[in-house]
């Protein structure tokens, strides 16, 4: 299933910070495109559900300490946050 992508304002800020830090944004874009297209991520990305304050969210790893937090609602995928563990939690 193909999803319509939406981005929170916080995600846009996080995205700019990742660029400033010199992260390989192509990796993030590839994973986001795969998620938008409804593809299953490879095991290395450790895609999983979150709990607690993030009960309806999912998280995947772009790299070992670079995460992407997102939500899926029917036909929409909302990219909420990206950054390191210490940035997000």
Predicted regions located by residue number:
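Basic, Lys/Arg-enriched alpha-helical interface segments
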Residues: 1-64, 72-80, 86-89
């Amino acid at each position: 299933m193909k999803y319509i992508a939406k981005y929170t304002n916080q995600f846009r800020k996080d995205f700019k910070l990742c660029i400033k830090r010199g992260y390989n944004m192509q990796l993030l874009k590839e994973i986001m495109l795969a998620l938008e297209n409804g593809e299953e991520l490879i095991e290395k990305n450790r895609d999983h559900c979150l709990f607690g304050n993030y009960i309806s969210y999912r998280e995947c790893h772009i790299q070992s300490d670079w995460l992407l937090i997102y939500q899926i609602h029917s036909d929409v995928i909302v990219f909420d946050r990206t950054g390191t563990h210490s940035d997000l939690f």
